[in-house]
Amino acid sequence: MGEEHKPLLDASGVDPREEDKTATAILRRKKKDNMLLVDDAINDDNSVIAINSNTMDKLELFRGDTVLVKGKKRKDTVLIVLIDDELEDGACRINRVVRNNLRIRLGDLVTIHPCPDIKYATRISVLPIADTIEGITGNLFDVFLKPYFVEAYRPVRKGDHFVVRGGMRQVEFKVVDVEPEEYAVVAQDTIIHWEGEPINREDEENNMNEVGYDDIGGCRKQMAQIREMVELPLRHPQLFKAIGIKPPRGVLMYGPPGTGKTLMARAVANETGAFFFLINGPEVMSKMAGESESNLRKAFEEAEKNAPAIIFIDEIDSIAPKRDKTNGEVERRVVSQLLTLMDGMKARSNVVVIAATNRPNSIDPALRRFGRFDREVDIGIPDATGRLEVLRIHTKNMKLADDVDLEALAAETHGYVGADIASLCSEAAMQQIREKMDLIDLDEDEIDAEVLDSLGVTMDNFRFALGNSNPSALRETVVESVNVTWDDVGGLDEIKEELKETVEYPVLHPDQYTKFGLSPSKGVLFYGPPGTGKTLLAKAVATEVSANFISVKGPELLSMWYGESESNIRDIFDKARAAAPTVVFLDELDSIAKARGGSLGDAGGASDRVVNQLLTEMDGMNAKKNVFVIGATNRPDQIDPAILRPGRLDQLIYVPLPDENARLSILNAQLRKTPLEPGLELTAIAKATQGFSGADLLYIVQRAAKYAIKDSIEAHRQHEAEKEVKVEGEDVEMTDEGAKAEQEPEVDPVPYITKEHFAEAMKTAKRSVSDAELRRYEAYSQQMKASRGQFSNFNFNDAPLGTTATDNANSNNSAPSGAGAAFGSNAEEDDDLYS
């Protein structure tokens, strides 16, 4: 009676907060006593594994026992156990050669199993690796093999390598064959066969470099999903039988190119030991009637014969397009054949079909139902943690300098997929080689060992590579590698601060937004007179956040073809989401986002459709994706009001003409790398240029520099002419004094920009924004402030119950008269839209 019933937190009885843990449960290895951490060996014997006495007692082993040691990628070998009490519990020592045989590194885990019933070998076959016997004469058996096997008890495993030292040399051998079984101990009467063609190391290394789970980074959750659906049915089909369901038949992997879809399928095949049958989509197709379907049937038959098997169809969209959209009869027949083959697979035939594509929506929908491709796994662009994993994988065999910070690189490579990171590492290594090119003699056959030892990829090499690469998802969109910092933007301090809050905070402090349960604002509109630095501000924002920067020039998006303009906008936002965090900068926004309703004369209302598409894209920006839209215009009155509502471009920032201090700041920013005449006061220019925009000031600076360059070139020419006249006029004696005069450094006639140059430049300077235009901008800005400042005096205690927001608005709304018509638009008529 008193029994307390606890309500289930979920239909499955699992606390929903534990969901993430179960999603990757298959990746967690269960820690057992016989799993040992690998340390480096002290004595370099190829046949031993050393563990301490406690571990030996726990595993019920004795010194000298033969054990089976399992590593990665289904590799194992047989070794003899020795005691080393300097080791900690749960650790073991294995030498480098054995580690290579097991495909493991220091710090990895191996499992140990007793192997008491190992037999003696009747015959083993060994062959040397070619590059280790160069220059050796004499009998390999007498010098190397006989002492190695006669002097010690040696268990061997087919396929293993071992290194033998003899005299001053060491030779590497491979066990090619063992009789009667794969594992055996070499005894006194074992026949050792060693004659044959030496093995080429390149061929061996290709076999050793098979892809495994360790070679895949950045998609931990997806890896867990695929292993659940592929590895479990292949290795333990009884699990599904016991629970009474059919195992999955097919998995469809989709995602941008370069994320590792093909690599993942190969890794699963290598680690499970399944037969791997690769079908490259286009290779199946044939012009002969019936041959394409026949090729598919053969692939499935071959896989069923060699079960457990994985059939991997790469680029499946090329052989299974939507049947109602294709004109070719062959494609339709191939799709139908694939459907019947997948339906015809026996329930527990131990064959799994994996397909990969980067265009999942162009595949025939009949393939995407349960029983065919049951599961769809989105292998997306990795986040910073994923990128760090991928960087570690690609740099594990690279020689890195001490200053390389992989975490910083991972943080800076937004939008990079695995293939981009591989390319980045390769480019950084090439840059290191280029830097050492002076020390390398290309004509020599061999490169000096000192030069090879001095190679090491530095952080500067990675920075260089970063500057020369961009994410492959954005290759066709012009992604500008922007190098504009806040220092390049003079003045506008308040606006800079506001921008930092809008764009930097969500990227650098996402935890704060989570804490307050809000999603950050994603849109900003700069408006103001031409030349005030709106575009420059957007570039500086992208650099400071180290986000990708997509610059969209309004008129470029418009196309004469029906629907093409909207499609261009969709593509840009899709790419921005793929490479997030991204700043999408819409320059001259008024050209593509004009107020709707007035575009009847253009291409069937193309402008209206573009605005509609832009609105839906801004609303559809996924909350998890950091995509910021910055618009810039100098005609804010022409922009559709729906774009300016909160949730879209909700922060309207007026970029005014600079005041005197801002003008001085702009001049300093523009001239910070330019030599100026000592004592030249820029304040005089700043004071004189009332009403000038940043672009107007840049014109003055460029004009002054132009005059300085002109004077410098003319002075140089005059100096050269004088020298020639001097040489022709008198025969100069080459005395010591003459030689000294020759060597004297030439004095630069124009070393800096002078006051005269600026005075000359000021004569042609002019304002680009008239007073009348400026008044219109100021009035519009005041109108926007007034419309958004209705409740500036709001106080919780002051608002009595029963008063409506409208009452408060009416009492506070004091927009300046005429402000609504600032740009010639009639605000009174607009307000009466629904009357």
UniProtKB/Swiss-Prot annotation:
Chain intervals for the UniProt region annotation (Disordered): 1-21, 720-746, 792-835
InterPro entries: AAA+_ATPase, AAA_ATPase_CDC48, AAA_ATPase_domain, AAA_lid_3, Asp_de-COase-like_dom_sf, ATPase_AAA_core, ATPase_AAA_CS, Cdc48_dom2
Note: Present with 78400 molecules/cell in log phase SD medium.
SUPFAM superfamilies: ADC-like, Cdc48 domain 2-like, P-loop containing nucleoside triphosphate hydrolases
Record field: compositional bias (Low complexity): 802-826
Binding site for ATP 1: P257, G258, T259, G260, K261, T262, L263, N358, H394
Basic and acidic residues biased stretches: 720-729
Annotated protein name in UniProt: Cell division control protein 48
Variant or mutagenesis effect after changing K261T: Probable loss of ATP binding. Complete loss of catalytic activity
Activity control: The first ATP-binding region has low ATPase activity. The second ATP-binding region is responsible for ATPase activity. ATP binding to the first ATP-binding region induces intrinsic activity of the second ATP-binding region. While ATP binding to the first ATP-binding region appears to prevent ATP hydrolysis by the second ATP-binding region, ADP-binding to first region promotes the coordinate and cooperative ATPase cycle of the second ATP-binding region.
Phosphothreonine PTM positions: T735
Coiled coil: none
Reactions accelerated catalytically: ATP + H2O = ADP + phosphate + H(+)
Residue list for modification Phosphoserine: S472, S519, S770
Gene expressing this chain: CDC48
Keyword field: ATP-binding, Cell cycle, Chaperone, Cytoplasm, Endoplasmic reticulum, Hydrolase, Isopeptide bond, Microsome, Nucleotide-binding, Phosphoprotein, Protein transport, Repeat, Transport, Ubl conjugation
UniProt cross-references to Pfam families, sorted A to Z: AAA, AAA_lid_3, CDC48_2, CDC48_N
Lineage: Eukaryota, Fungi, Dikarya, Ascomycota, Saccharomycotina
Annotated phenotype, changing E315N: Severe reduction in growth rate
Covalent crosslink: Glycyl lysine isopeptide (Lys-Gly) (interchain with G-Cter in ubiquitin): K305, K322, K346, K522, K539, K594, K673
Effect of K534 to A/T: Severe loss of catalytic activity. Lethal
Function of the molecule: ATP-dependent chaperone which probably uses the energy provided by ATP hydrolysis to generate mechanical force to unfold substrate proteins, disassemble protein complexes, and disaggregate protein aggregates. By recruiting and promoting the degradation of ubiquitinated proteins, plays a role in the ubiquitin fusion degradation (UFD) pathway. Has a role in the endoplasmic reticulum-associated degradation (ERAD) pathway which mediates the cytoplasmic elimination of misfolded proteins exported from the ER.
Keyword flag Phosphoprotein: yes
Consequence of substituting E315A: Moderate reduction in growth rate
Localization, UniProt: Microsome; Endoplasmic reticulum; Cytoplasm
